[in-house]
């Protein structure tokens, strides 16, 4: 009975918050400056990580770029330097906790306190449960979520001490809506979304108001990791479009970014619609991509 009374008492606040959100739709939010900020981006040698580095370089941030691919990392760094940015590169295996911690120690000693951390590195294996090797499942979790814990543990304390910073989680629409034949990937991205939400709540509980969090959840992105993706929602997104949304979200301190925006609507539908209807809807959306299927149906 008490909870019902509490909910009724909160009703005026709900109305005020809804009106406030509606008004904000028509008022462009001021973008913060990131000039001079030390920005560390994992997975910076390709795709979203590379393009995000370019955007921060244009905004005069100091860049710390991590990737396991030395050649890709050097290409990204060269372009960023051409844009006038100060750039530091580290070849780091984000599936290796000790490599992350030792590299983080070097960054703090040689460059300074990271104030914007972009956890972007990721791997994906397009296969069903039986065709996905145990080592691939382990690596998916090591890179796609455990690395977020290790990097954040390494760099968040300085942000909290200064009450200034930003932790960015690059997740996926597959962290909200499951997809067949991406079992390990979906599981890791659901974890990444949960990491972002729990970290956000933890910072609020500790009254650390100056450290912001942002989570990016795009649909299929045309980066070459998933072969021949298609859905009835439209073609795979170009990475430039996704990074534009990401940068706008970081600079305006948005908590959750969906790309395209319709993904947000689908996440709501999944929570309120009957399961039978959802099954039909998912068939209509018709997500397809090249995948290895290990399960063999028995002959009838």
UniProtKB/Swiss-Prot annotation:
A Pfam family that the UniProt record links to this protein: adh_short
Keywords, ordered alphabetically: Endoplasmic reticulum, Lipid biosynthesis, Lipid droplet, Lipid metabolism, NADP, Oxidoreductase, Signal, Steroid biosynthesis
Gene3D superfamilies with a match to the protein in the record: NAD(P)-binding Rossmann-like Domain
Residues annotated as signal peptide: 1-18
Enzyme Commission no: 1.1.1.62
Molecular functions (GO terms): estradiol 17-beta-dehydrogenase [NAD(P)+] activity
GO biological process: steroid biosynthetic process
SUPFAM superfamilies the record matches: NAD(P)-binding Rossmann-fold domains
Domain of life of the source: Eukaryota
Subcellular location: Endoplasmic reticulum; Lipid droplet
Coiled coil: none
Catalysed reactions, as listed in the record: 17beta-estradiol + NAD(+) = estrone + NADH + H(+); 17beta-estradiol + NADP(+) = estrone + NADPH + H(+)
Residues annotated as catalytic: 185 (proton acceptor)
Location, primary (coarse class): endoplasmic reticulum
Top enzyme category: oxidoreductase
Family classification: Belongs to the short-chain dehydrogenases/reductases (SDR) family. 17-beta-HSD 3 subfamily.
Role noted for this protein: Can convert androstan-3-alpha,17-beta-diol (3-alpha-diol) to androsterone in vitro, suggesting that it may participate in androgen metabolism during steroidogenesis. May act by metabolizing compounds that stimulate steroid synthesis and/or by generating metabolites that inhibit it. Has no activity toward DHEA (dehydroepiandrosterone), or A-dione (4-androste-3,17-dione), and only a slight activity toward testosterone to A-dione.
Protein name per Swiss-Prot or TrEMBL: Estradiol 17-beta-dehydrogenase 11
Protein source organism: Macaca fascicularis (Crab-eating macaque)
